[in-house]
């Protein structure tokens, strides 16, 4: 399906995920948007801000606590999305025709979210709802089993797949830092369709699992699967901000961003995820599909969509 598409741009520009982003591994560089620099030279929020954090460990003021703003009151992500709402949003994920039937559980979603401080808990209630809607929308597009005349509509069929169909490559790029394990393939798996060894490696390191040796965990352990998607969501990959920073209003576009049409909103998240393929060339059905999921989920959660939903006129990030 679209498993390999998510990181295709990264493959064309290998420095995106192969080289470290900050700290001693990157000439002392600091992370954008006041993110922590982990001991391994990667930008993000918890767990990047723990032991060995190199810089901005409590935002741009130093220290050793997580950079993500203190979540608002009201509990974790379960206070925004109940089990019943989750089932309503991902209405047909357990349909008999879906490859992922029974895999993507509410409990796994909540458990994974609790490992990423700030996910679905940053800001006021509307901001929190909008983040969950945006995350589930982007990942629903990546895993959709819907079609135009599907029962309950195309946007009720997110999370139908958990791994790429018909993969013709093992997605192994030679890398000293993220070496491929013998006999393993790194095709798209999970909600974000994680692809390539140079993404499995840092994702696994961030969540404490060796995904280079055990990539199948992304399609067999639902909590690990959700965690890889949330790692992608919460992690900035310069010059891209994190999707979390965008949807929670923490990202301020630079002059270069504004000149490229990249302004805050759901559209720039699509640009982060797959802009090199989908953005900057006018109307695109894939962008429209992502927006369709997003609007449905916002409607279910009772929150406005915000502005700038598409990336039709945005230049992709370099």
From Swiss-Prot:
GO molecular function: chitin binding; endochitinase activity
Signal peptide: 1-19
Pfam families associated with the record: Chitin_bind_1, Glyco_hydro_19
Catalytic activity: Random endo-hydrolysis of N-acetyl-beta-D-glucosaminide (1->4)-beta-linkages in chitin and chitodextrins
InterPro entries: Chitin-bd_1 (IPR001002), Chitin-binding_1_CS (IPR018371), Endochitinase-like_sf (IPR036861), Glyco_hydro_19 (IPR016283), Glyco_hydro_19_cat (IPR000726), Lysozyme-like_dom_sf (IPR023346)
General function of this protein: Defense against chitin-containing fungal pathogens.
Name assigned to this protein: 26 kDa endochitinase 1
Organism listed in the record: Hordeum vulgare
Lineage: Eukaryota, Viridiplantae, Streptophyta, Embryophyta, Tracheophyta
């Amino acid at each position: 399906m679209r498993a390999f598409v998510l990181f295709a741009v990264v493959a064309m520009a290998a420095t995106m995920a192969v080289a470290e982003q900050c700290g001693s591994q990157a000439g002392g560089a600091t992370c954008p948007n006041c993110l922590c620099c982990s001991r391994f030279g990667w930008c993000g929020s918890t767990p990047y801000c723990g032991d060995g954090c190199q810089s901005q460990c409590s935002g741009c003021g130093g220290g050793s606590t997580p950079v993500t703003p203190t979540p608002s009151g009201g509990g974790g992500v379960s206070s925004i999305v109940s089990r019943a709402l989750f089932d309503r949003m991902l209405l047909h994920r357990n349909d008999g025709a879906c490859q992922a039937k029974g895999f993507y559980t509410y409990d796994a979603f909540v458990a994974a979210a609790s490992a990423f401080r700030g996910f679905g808990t940053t800001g006021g209630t509307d901001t929190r709802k909008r983040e969950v809607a945006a995350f589930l929308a982007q990942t629903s597009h990546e895993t959709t089993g819907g079609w135009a005349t599907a029962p309950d509509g195309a946007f009720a069929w997110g999370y139908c797949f958990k791994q790429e169909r018909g993969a013709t490559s093992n997605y192994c790029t030679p890398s000293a830092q993220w070496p491929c394990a013998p006999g393993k393939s790194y095709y798209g798996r999970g909600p974000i369709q994680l692809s390539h060894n140079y993404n499995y490696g840092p994702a696994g390191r961030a969540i404490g699992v060796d995904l280079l040796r055990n990539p199948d965990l992304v399609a067999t352990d639902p909590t690990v699967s959700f965690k890889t998607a949330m790692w992608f969501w919460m992690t900035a990959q310069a010059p891209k901000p994190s999707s979390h920073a965008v949807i929670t209003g923490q990202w301020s576009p630079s002059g270069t961003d504004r000149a490229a049409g990249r302004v805050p909103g759901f559209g720039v998240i699509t640009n982060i995820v797959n802009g090199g393929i989908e953005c900057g060339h006018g109307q695109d059905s894939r962008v429209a599909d992502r927006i369709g999921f997003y609007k449905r989920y916002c409607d279910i959660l009772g929150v406005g969509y915000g502005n700038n939903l598409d990336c039709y006129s945005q230049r992709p990030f370099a």
